[in-house]
């Protein structure tokens, strides 16, 4: 996916990924390995979908949005020196397993095997209450809380006027991951307004910039 510069993303770009050449040359993520996990999109060996993810009005699929956002985040982090590994890609958009829970464990195990410094899961939310909206960041192990705070704070700054559902501790983030791990719900597909936003490439790029900014800020602080 080709990243498109939008006016909404300019403040983040100028404050982090551009700026003075000497600052950009520092590459704060040098030596850092990150696993990005765009959620869902699992089939069994027979080719049947067993984890489709949420959907919005007009057929918008969570799995597609998560993948596009993650593939926009990846080069931003690589530009800062990180090695980025994706659990699925545009060329290989589907994963295969016998259950959704087993596949989720497999994604975390991948992060363990590559000795990732952070495991970042990208999702969109869904709720029976169509009025429910906003972004939420989840963590499980307490050592993951600083990463959750950094990414969530960046999203709050990037999304003025959007509902902030806060940072929450939930075991579904990953009990298997042995490094800081978070799950980011970028917005709510079942909400009419946010569902439309999440389907817009400009908004997806804006979200990607915010997540990337939060990750960079986390590692900058962890090195001090």
For every predicted segment, state its role.
Residues 8-17:
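Bacterial N-terminal signal peptides
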Residues 1-8:
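Bacterial N-terminal signal peptides that target proteins for export
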Residues 46-60, 125-150:
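A short, glycine/acidic-enriched catalytic loop
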Residues 25-107:
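Active-site histidine-acidic residue metal-binding/catalytic motifs
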Residues 40-43, 90-94, 124-130, 142-145, ...:
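Solvent-exposed loop/turn segments at secondary-structure junctions
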Residues 114, 121-129, 166-224:
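Active-site-adjacent mobile loop/cap segments within catalytic or ligand-binding domains
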């Amino acid at each position: 996916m080709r990243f498109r510069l939008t006016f909404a993303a300019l403040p983040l770009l100028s404050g982090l990924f551009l700026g003075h050449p000497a600052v950009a040359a520092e590459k704060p993520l040098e030596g850092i390995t990150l696993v990005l996990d765009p959620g869902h999109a699992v089939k069994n060996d027979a080719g049947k979908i067993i984890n489709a993810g949420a959907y919005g009005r007009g057929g918008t699929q969570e799995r597609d949005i998560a993948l596009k956002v993650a593939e926009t985040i990846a080069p931003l982090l690589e530009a800062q020196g990180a090695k980025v590994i994706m659990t699925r890609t545009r060329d290989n958009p589907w994963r295969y397993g016998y259950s959704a829970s087993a596949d989720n464990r497999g994604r975390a195990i991948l992060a363990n095997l590559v000795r990732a410094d952070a495991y970042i899961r990208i999702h969109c939310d869904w709720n029976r209450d169509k009025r429910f909206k906003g972004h939420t960041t989840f963590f499980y192990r307490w050592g993951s809380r600083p990463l959750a705070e950094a990414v969530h704070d960046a999203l709050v700054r990037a999304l003025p006027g959007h509902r902030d559902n806060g940072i929450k501790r939930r075991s579904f983030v990953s009990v298997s991951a042995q490094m800081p791990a978070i799950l980011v719900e970028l917005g709510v597909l079942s909400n009419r307004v946010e569902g439309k936003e999440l389907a817009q490439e400009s908004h997806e790029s804006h979200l990607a910039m915010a997540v990337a900014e939060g990750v960079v800020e986390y590692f900058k602080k962890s090195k001090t």
